[in-house]
């Protein structure tokens, strides 16, 4: 067996680089984090060949002392910690002293730096782990690091790299995360000599819009909770913005991007009542806590962390998001923020640029940021701006109208007449309303009396509730309502589903069970063996949900009682679905954790079905319930319950003012 021998420092660095520098994006992260720790207010990044051929990072930070510039490329050499106590209280982005040494061991690295009190800069080069002697160089205050030909001396590692486009995408994503965490720092990115983006120092609100997108910003809810010792802030997207991807999920702990299971689980739990399982929420969350309350020294990449009190963190994240999402009700926020834009896309109307207050300058242009008048390219890292604001239109294509046949016209008029036919009750309501509001009106003779449109009975705009008042039912599916300055479309089944669900949850929390009523005649149905077994195992649980079933023998079950709230539902289908849920859940201990899922299934059965004709009082009652129900902007599956089209959007649709 060979004798034990100490490995050369250069080989040790190359082995360490396998953990620290897996790809160009990791090298970029280490260098930019050093710039942030140096107090830079501007960081410029240039990439060639996706970062494989060249990574160049320049900053205007404090720079490196000439006597320390060689030491900066040695392993475990750092200015950020000196004792173990410093490590426990570290607040800097980097602290291990491995980053630059690892990069220098697998690339051709050039480090040039100058401090403010130095007459010139100092430059040192490293190739294959060998350092050159420091030399004088011309350079402004700050530091520039160039890492060329990454993995040139480790061909086996280089074979594992992906294409230049893929590696560039990882680099751009990494830089976007760092820019998002530090909005007070200006960032720019060039790819193969072409400017990709240039972000000035800006507010967090503006930085989120620039990185995550204006569509996210429009559909997001701001959050800010906690105290000086533990604070959570940022923005979370409304459930209707949810996607099937996780590319818009950002967790930052003390301004460090992390992938933490505790925070992600808390987010998932907060969204579980308003989001379908196949969709993922979008969010930008910043958690600030004392450095000693979190261990960032878990992995060299520092994306994995450990909280000292993970339960406290979980509760803060869950309760903050849950409260924000519970307030997504019709009287507080819109269900869908871009309904007008979606409608414009359907009709093929093309937006044209809108003149801004700054004579065409984009979101990031200001006199203070760009005194020379140069306007930066604010596209995101992949070349798209993501701007979706409503704009004036040009080259518009008007919606086409088609003539109806005589038969279709008569059918439409019959439907209209049925919806708007007046009854004595409606006349009485209108008369009472007019008298209460306007006093005694001059009487009309029958010969001169004219029919009053139903909409005349709607209160004035100043008296309208958030969802207004219903004026019609469309196709047996939607409710059409008029609000203060807009037209509303409400999915009556989805809305009723959410209202019933929240009512049942509240009743279960207050009473421990759902109030039930016995059926005059029990309803029997043929059941499967699994359904019979579920009844035998969970009869008491079913009673807690307001369902009383009995086994009649011969695989026949009888429904004897059903929840009062769901009295008009199909009790057989309801019983089958609840039994199916219980069979899937299994043991009684896990039923509690799946209670909301069972209630969601039940609420679906008790909701208004498509095709059912509602009276105006019934429609308005549903609208008022929505205004007073938490999370009423989405149904139990995360779909929107209502959309709003403002008068401006309707005018645009009909080309008014063009």
UniProtKB/Swiss-Prot annotation:
One of its GO terms (biological process) is mismatch repair. This protein is involved in the repair of mismatches in DNA. It is required for dam-dependent methyl-directed DNA mismatch repair. May act as a 'molecular matchmaker', a protein that promotes the formation of a stable complex between two or more DNA-binding proteins in an ATP-dependent manner without itself being part of a final effector complex. The gene is mutL. Residues 114-130 have a biased composition (Basic and acidic residues). Belongs to the DNA mismatch repair MutL/HexB family. The lineage of its organism: Bacteria, Pseudomonadati, Pseudomonadota, Betaproteobacteria, Neisseriales. InterPro entries: DNA_mismatch_repair_CS, DNA_mismatch_repair_MutL, DNA_mismatch_S5_2-like, HATPase_C_sf, MutL/Mlh/PMS, MutL/Mlh/Pms-like, MutL_C, MutL_C_dimsub. It comes from the Bacteria. Residues 114-138, 355-405 are annotated as: Disordered. Pfam families: DNA_mis_repair, HATPase_c_3, MutL_C. This is DNA mismatch repair protein MutL. Keywords: DNA damage, DNA repair. CDD domains: HATPase_MutL-MLH-PMS-like, MutL_Trans_MutL. HAMAP family: DNA_mis_repair. PANTHER family: DNA MISMATCH REPAIR PROTEIN MLH, PMS, MUTL, DNA MISMATCH REPAIR PROTEIN MLH1. Coiled coil: none annotated. One of its GO terms (cellular component) is mismatch repair complex. GO terms for molecular function: ATP binding; ATP hydrolysis activity; ATP-dependent DNA damage sensor activity; mismatched DNA binding.
